[in-house]
Amino acid sequence: PVHPVLRLERLADDLIVSQPTFDQMTDAFTATLATARARGVVSFKSIAAYRTGLQIDAPDPHAARQDFRRLKETAAQTGRVRLAHKALNDYLLDLALTAAARQELPVQFHTGFGDSDADLRLANPLHLRRVIEGYPATQLVLLHSGWPYYRELAHLAAIYPNVWLDLSLAIPFATTGIPAMLRDVLGMAPFSKVLFATDAFTMPEIYWVAARWGRWGLTQVLDDFVHAGFFTAAEAHQAAQAILADNARRLYPIGAEP
């Protein structure tokens, strides 16, 4: 089954172009978010790591309005915009985090490595501490293991109830490093907070490789834990079931799907 995820910055890009005033834009943004779950959306997603960085500040309405004005000037010339203005993006993320909590929807954040336009220094999940502590009712799914900051992300998942660690992209692109990454992640984060995913794209073969390598790495690590006496065989099976499927079923409003 496939379920939609609402991409926050893409929605903002469209509304900045289409709405004539700041207030109309934010009203339309809020209204779209407010009906998301009723329309089948299972999560919001932010790529602030690409656009403005993960050090998301408290909302500043005056600065956000100034950013909107600048972007409208760009839209008038080109017909499109790319929201890379920090004050406005931080302001809209505050609205989104609040709307997500009201609907019991998680919010995904890109963290760590990605395409060449991502500044890795701004993608460290530790930058999200203010958001994590400021929105305790919002479940935050930090994507891609935060690679190469996966130890930091595992620490956040261990100490904050609303932080989840998603393994996508690190599986499969960490390749031979997958077992080492999983060993460190599961040595710190509770397995009930770790989500198997791939972020596979374009070619079906990537999905196959990711599924195979992810299970290979997880099997290696859990076998080691059993042999070391940390887990029983039954506990290792429970951990694998949770990471591969059950945690996602608990987190996302997708029901008990096969």
Ranges and model annotations:
Residues 1-26, 34:
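Long, mid-chain structured domain cores
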Residues 10, 48-50, 111-115, 146-149, ...:
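Active-site-proximal loop/turn and secondary-structure-junction residues that shape catalytic pockets
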Residues 13-14, 51-55, 115-118, 203-206:
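Short catalytic/ligand-binding loop motif for oxyanion handling, primarily in non-cytosolic enzymes
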Residues 14-23, 80-87, 169-171:
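The substrate-binding groove and active-site-proximal loops of carbohydrate-active enzymes
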Residues 24-45, 53-163, 177-195, 213:
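Histidine/acidic residue-rich metal-binding segments in metalloenzymes
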Residues 165, 173-226:
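C-terminal hydrophobic structural anchor segments
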Residues 191-193, 208-258:
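Mid-to-C-terminal alpha-helical segments outside catalytic/metal-binding sites
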